[in-house]
């Protein structure tokens, strides 16, 4: 196993980090700001849930079209597009001026985080590894769990200092 890790560290680290960074578009992370978002935009729980559902469905409907880029371009090039797109989404999301902007921000987070980041990770690793694909995937999937374990605590600590918008 160590030989496999050493020989393929670059690809495994890339996949792990992509799955880790997908956390910013996952429900567990966005939900950390749910109360503040509802308060800021004067939304009920149901209204926010409906908006979130629409953003998620929009992302799901867009994913096959955007994901097609992975079929026609090198995965590393797609990653070089998806990473800055997710970073920009994280930066603009908390400062959207109205509910329409909030919906767009949620859509972008869901599309580039939960959707494209994960799809790119699995595609990069799936293409690179043919004989050991299952082993490789099993080594990048913990990026999701690492995000679930570490990022909520980091977000809560940072938001206690900078507020929810500053933490994003």
Where are these regions (language model features)?
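Helix-to-loop junctions at the C-terminal end of transmembrane segments
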Residues: 61-74
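Pair of pore-lining "gating" transmembrane helices in MFS-fold secondary transporters
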Residues: 6-29
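Hydrophobic core of transmembrane alpha-helices in multi-pass small-molecule transporters
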Residues: 20, 89, 100-116
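Residue-level signature of mid-helix packing/kink "hotspots" within the transmembrane helices
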Residues: 28, 56-64, 148-149
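Helix-loop-helix hairpin linking two adjacent transmembrane segments in secondary transporters
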Residues: 144-168
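Primarily marks hydrophobic transmembrane alpha-helices of the MFS/SLC 12-helix fold
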Residues: 76-79
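C-terminal ends and interior cores of transmembrane alpha-helices
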Residues: 84-97
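Intracellular juxtamembrane helix-capping segments at the cytosolic ends
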Residues: 115-129
